[in-house]
Regions:
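C-terminal motif of bacterial Sec signal peptides marking the signal peptidase cleavage site
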Residues: 15-18
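Tryptophan-anchored aromatic micro-motifs
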Residues: 27-44
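Exposed, flexible binding/inhibitory loops of compact, secreted disulfide-stabilized domains
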Residues: 30-32, 49, 56-57
Length: 141
């Protein structure tokens, strides 16, 4: 019986030691964010709340979907790198190729397929991202 317990403990230890878990370091960024407003740096503003545009953030993936947008429903996937004050999106294609046409992603707050945002505000309820041309305001949903 003692040998069986030792064998079981050894197998369990080896099994658990072989597992690596990648944990998300995104902090408040993780979750579903509803795009509430898109402001141009020049002063224009568009209320996007009724279009139900959502950015879903998990681990290193960002998915953009729209549920009431009049032209298209999104379904765009991007990888992202986040630092304390910036967010850089890049295509989710394994080979790094462009998966989408810029004209299709532009209505969802992107001006480039490799977009770089400055994080103006990020907490558990609100997020404000600013690119060279746009300011995106989100609420956590």
């Amino acid at each position: 019986m003692k040998k069986i317990l030792i064998l079981f403990a050894a197998v369990l230890t080896m099994t658990l030691a072989g597992c690596t878990l990648d944990a998300s370091n995104n902090g408040d960024m993780d979750g579903n964010w509803q795009l509430m407003r898109v402001d141009t740096i020049g002063g224009g503003s568009t209320d996007t709340k009724n279009w139900q545009i959502f950015y879903a953030v998990q681990f290193r993936l960002l998915e953009i979907n729209a549920y009431s947008y009049p032209v298209g429903n999104g379904g765009f996937m991007f990888h992202f790198d986040q630092t304390r004050d910036s967010l850089k999106l890049s295509t989710a294609a394994a080979d790094g190729s462009e998966m989408y046409d810029l004209k299709n992603v532009a209505p969802f707050g992107l001006t480039s397929l490799d977009e770089h945002f400055k994080i103006q505000l990020l907490n558990s309820d609100n997020m404000v991202l600013e690119s060279k041309k746009l300011r995106l305001t989100f609420r956590k949903f």
